[in-house]
Curated annotation (Swiss-Prot):
Gene Ontology cellular-component terms listed: preribosome, small subunit precursor
Protein's UniProt name: Endoribonuclease Nob1
Classification via HAMAP family: VapC_Nob1
UniProt similarity note: Belongs to the PINc/VapC protein family.
EC main group: hydrolase
Region (Flexible linker) location: 147-152
CDD domains: PIN_Nob1-like
Its biological purpose: Toxic component of a type II toxin-antitoxin (TA) system. Processes pre-16S-rRNA at its 3' end (the D-site) to yield the mature 3' end.
């Protein structure tokens, strides 16, 4: 079921957009809620000049000193809101992060949880965040770079015999040959089977 549009949707009526045009704009995602991580703001995303509702977390604000003026203006104009996600969504993200092995900070997890909480589009150039977002079916858009289309997980790999271990494997030495282990990105997407002619 389609939820009611945000206030910006109705403001567009004033500039003589037809109801049909307005509805298409809303459905296209322009007016959808957007969550911004630190990389999105640092790489030039400006909530003041963009349509839609923008949110970020308190932790992100601590990392974006270089864009402090823009952020403060966006907050003053009501174009950016600060919100912490509900704990249940943080737990969901943490479960996925544990499976993928992505090395994400609590700030990264918070941004993902907020996007999940608000059913929002997530703006980020961080490939680790994008990877976890895919697993959570969160729509992602990049700013300076196109979002990665790769689907991967992290594993530990033996430098000697190449045996793979889960990323949370506690030892740093291979149980088979005794060589050291290192983290490695592994594709998790299965290759599609070719159809028989």
């Amino acid at each position: 079921m389609l939820s009611l549009p945000p206030p910006e949707f109705y403001k567009l009526w004033i500039i003589n957009k037809s109801p049909y045009q307005l509805f298409n704009i809303y459905r296209s995602g322009i007016m959808k809620v957007k969550v911004l991580d630190a990389s999105a703001i640092i790489h030039g995303y400006n909530p003041i000049i963009e349509e839609g509702e923008h949110y970020t977390t308190p932790e992100v604000l601590e990392e974006i000193e270089s864009k402090k003026i823009i952020v403060e203006q966006a907050l003053d104009f009501g174009k950016l809101k600060i919100m912490s996600p509900n704990r249940e969504y943080i737990k969901k993200v943490e479960e996925v992060v544990k499976k993928t092995g992505d090395n994400l900070s609590q700030q990264d997890i918070g941004v993902l949880a907020l996007a999940l909480n608000l059913n929002a589009i997530l703006y980020t150039d961080d490939y680790g965040i994008q990877n976890v977002a895919k697993k959570l079916n969160i729509e992602v858009r990049g700013i300076a770079f196109e979002p990665t289309n790769k689907d991967f997980i992290w594993r530990k790999i033996c430098e000697g015999c190449k045996k793979l271990y889960p990323v949370d494997y506690e030892e740093d030495i291979c149980e088979i040959c005794g060589s050291p282990l290192k983290r490695k990105m592994v594709k998790s997407r299965l290759k599609k089977k070719r159809k028989k002619k």
